[in-house]
């Protein structure tokens, strides 16, 4: 059924192009899992369920792990990512890999979300001339289009939340360390995490629980190395469905961060309607003030540049001589040598800036990282949550999908506010769930909170979802239907 839908909806000139590679072993694996089930062996709720994963997540099978880059074409990882091992143990069927913004959108300044030199352009299923956002573009578009049951995305800043909200699905960006980062092509270790994407909060909760676990290769999952890394030991669950409460808004104290509402009156109206639902469901709303995110905008980029050079060099070196590139420097040179195929629309300024950075012992790096955590955590989310005794903070997840523009990149985006950076920079959890539509284009509402508060956020997001039930499936229109307000 899913393979038929993929052939009909994803492939071809007018397809959404969300999948970069299908698992050639999918059918025999499915047969083996069905046989297990017929014999009474059911591993859990994901047994036999088709899951798509982003193409920057390692699998040691017949599928390559490329981050959408031509430089890694054909690269077969030496072993499964830890989260993939966990999914296979849970009985999930890894159906294939999804397209993404190349290198998880950390290559050039004027990039186009959802485009990679290896996978081409992923489109939004609600309007094919609109962006699917990124960098987890394919993971979101595939789930929205029912090409799989659930998918896995990754985020450094916004790469789960933006595509989830733009494609009208639920997405969870977990606390740093809840899910192992080992076996994921990195952007920056202080912010990188994988997370679930699904059509419902319940499905996202199931997938989240299947991916948690202590990984010896990722200290953040096992012990408290420092304030930066945290620890998931005793704070992770393997079953998040226990927190699905349709009355979860009752008695909740929710902070309203209007600094993140932007200026789009249509978006604001949708969120205000959502706030009324929360109030009528028994939640108490409190107006809160967060420090402007632009205070740590430059320092965030500084940290990402330093870490990108170090982390990517480490990952590429681990692949050995089987790949064409063994370092960030090699990638930059490969891209220049293959400019017509790799750099036709935008450059690699981010990579070049990262290459110029020194090591992680730099005082400049340490100061930027400390500033990030002070503003996003101590003076940001932690301070507001503590002062008002909150269960979560809410804001819009973004605006309506903008028109795809390969000439100018994402510069034409309509959303004028950054609602993802607080939780991303802090390493704290963030959930988006559909809240409404503008001319048929999805708008999501965000819930975020302090470290390890996934249970509470799932409770609130699920209750909101059940009270509103606004999600409608995409119609794969060539362009947005302007007759629909």
Q: What residues fall within each predicted segment?
A:
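Gly/Ser-rich catalytic/binding loops embedded in alpha/beta enzyme cores
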Residues: 1-157, 175, 199, 385-387, ...
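An N-terminal boundary/leader segment
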Residues: 1-29, 38, 270-273, 279-282, ...
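Sec/Tat-exported extracytoplasmic proteins
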Residues: 3-13, 23, 30-37, 41, ...
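Acyltransferase
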Residues: 31, 81, 263-289, 311-337, ...
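Short helix-loop capping/hinge segments that flank enzyme active sites or metal/cofactor-binding pockets
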Residues: 47-67, 242-259, 306-377, 432-442
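Glycine-rich, small-residue loops and helix-cap segments
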Residues: 48, 54, 89, 148, ...
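Flexible glycine/proline-enriched surface loops and loop-helix/loop-strand junctions
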Residues: 66-69, 122-128, 135, 185-193, ...
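Structural helix-boundary/capping segments
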Residues: 89, 93, 144-258, 272-281, ...
């Amino acid at each position: 059924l899913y393979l038929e839908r993929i052939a009909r909806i994803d492939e071809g000139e007018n397809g959404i192009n969300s999948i970069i590679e299908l698992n050639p072993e999918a059918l025999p694996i499915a047969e083996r899992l069905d046989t297990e089930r017929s014999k009474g062996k059911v591993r859990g709720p994901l047994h036999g369920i088709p899951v798509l994963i982003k193409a920057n997540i390692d699998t040691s099978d017949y599928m390559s792990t490329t981050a959408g880059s031509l430089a890694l074409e054909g690269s077969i990882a030496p072993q499964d990512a830890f989260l993939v091992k966990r999914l296979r143990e849970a009985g999930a069927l890894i159906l294939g890999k999804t397209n993404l913004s190349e290198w998880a959108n950390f290559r050039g300044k004027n990039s186009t979300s959802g485009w990679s030199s290896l996978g081409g352009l992923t489109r939004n299923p609600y309007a094919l001339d609109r962006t699917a956002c990124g960098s987890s573009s394919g993971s979101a578009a595939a789930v929205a289009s029912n090409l799989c049951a659930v998918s896995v995305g990754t985020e450094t800043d916004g790469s789960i939340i933006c595509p989830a909200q733009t494609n009208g699905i639920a997405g969870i960006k977990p606390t740093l360390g809840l899910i192992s980062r080992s076996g994921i092509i990195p952007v920056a270790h202080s912010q990188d995490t994988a997370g679930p994407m699904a059509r419902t909060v319940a499905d996202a909760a199931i997938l989240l629980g299947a991916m948690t676990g202590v990984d010896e290769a990722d200290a953040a999952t096992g012990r408290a190395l420092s304030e930066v890394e945290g620890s998931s030991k005793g704070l992770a669950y393997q079953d998040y469905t226990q927190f699905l409460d349709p009355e979860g808004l009752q008695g909740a104290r929710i902070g309203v961060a209007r600094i993140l509402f932007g200026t789009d009156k249509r978006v604001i109206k949708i969120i205000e309607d959502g706030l009324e639902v929360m109030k009528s469901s028994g939640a108490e709303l409190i107006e809160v003030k967060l420090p402007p995110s632009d205070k740590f905008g430059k320092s965030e980029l500084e940290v990402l540049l330093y870490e990108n050079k170090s982390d990517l060099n480490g990952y590429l070196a681990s692949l050995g001589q089987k790949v064409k590139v063994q370092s960030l420097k090699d990638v930059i040179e490969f891209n220049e040598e293959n400019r017509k195929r790799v750099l036709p629309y935008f450059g690699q300024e981010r990579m070049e800036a990262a290459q110029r950075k020194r090591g992680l012992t730099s005082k400049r790096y340490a100061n930027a990282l400390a500033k990030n955590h002070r503003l996003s955590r101590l003076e940001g989310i932690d301070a507001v949550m503590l002062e008002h005794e909150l269960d979560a903070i809410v804001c819009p997840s973004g605006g309506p999908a903008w028109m795809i523009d390969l000439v100018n990149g994402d510069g034409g985006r309509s959303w004028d506010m950054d609602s993802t950076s607080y939780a991303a920079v802090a390493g704290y959890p963030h959930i988006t769930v559909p809240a409404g539509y503008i001319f048929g284009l999805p708008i999501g509402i965000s819930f975020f909170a302090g470290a390890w508060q996934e249970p509470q956020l799932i409770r609130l997001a699920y209750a909101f979802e059940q009270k509103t039930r606004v999600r409608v499936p995409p119609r794969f229109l060539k362009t947005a239907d302007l007759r629909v307000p």
